[in-house]
């Protein structure tokens, strides 16, 4: 093994294998369950990489495994869940890697907000939420005020995020949150209104390069469920350059100045505001879109960075390719996923649309207000991101995600791919924020 990948995103493993091969390296995937990567593994030769099933949260066990000969030359981690495990593992093995303290900071959303506020890069502060009573509600009404977002400091996959627009919603959300388990702690911050985007950046030695910006079309309030993504957004050059400078300042403020970053932000009437900083390449089909739209295998930069080398992509001018877009396919009712109707129609539609499955028949779909609920992704291309979006939406509209009741009280149904998320809980505003595919945040 020369390059080790500690788990991976649902999509992109094939690109990573080909990137390692192009650079003369052999990829080994460490995973708790190889079946999670069935889609990608089925499309690779059997000997394309080594797959080792092991407990990937056990740092001691992983260290012992990787200290055996031959030792790896680099370690890749592209998921939120294993970010800190990978950082500790790289440190133990003496491999090129990022400062674990920086990665811990990026995984704490309230700490990121505080750091950006201190640097003058956000107008809002993070306020801890320590209870559910009237005194807590009163404190939130004072700061950050309404509308506000309440969320988990270490949340992922769009879970445990609430939009609060009035005092009644605040009381309901505090009551609901009191019964939830959090990966971190609950905090409040201002709700920044405006279109949502994600910046796909690559950094090295303090310089940040903006590879492009993805649009994020969201479900109606109070939900934060992602519906459609397109890349690259066609910003006028002065605005693109200003965004690149701002992103460089944002990432420098948290000390994350090397490797890929996926920065979600809102373009408010008063300028950009960070939603969250992800120290990795984007999930879902963002990596696929980068490869196709830029005309290069961006995963070579992942391998080069893991080896401690300046990625060639920092200085290259990619040849370019088609713009891309994808639609997340959600059921409108929970239940057992049974398949997708209409896939045979995709071949006759413009934009070379394709269905990328995330769930297998028999999987239970329980949560529809965040990214846990989608069954797959409809991908399409176009001459511009706008045209690619039209193609992807037309293809998604030709499909029906099929579910059947999981129990006697469940609603059956063929259901539309698109549409607002139903309210899954008594409290208004229960929602996810951000999202991604597979392990994007998983």
What function would you assign to each model-found segment?
Residues 1-102, 359-364, 369-373, 381-400, ...:
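ATP-binding N-terminal substructure of ATP-dependent carboxylate-amine bond-forming enzymes
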Residues 65-72, 143-144, 180-181, 254:
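Glycine-rich phosphate-binding loop signature in dinucleotide/nucleotide-binding domains
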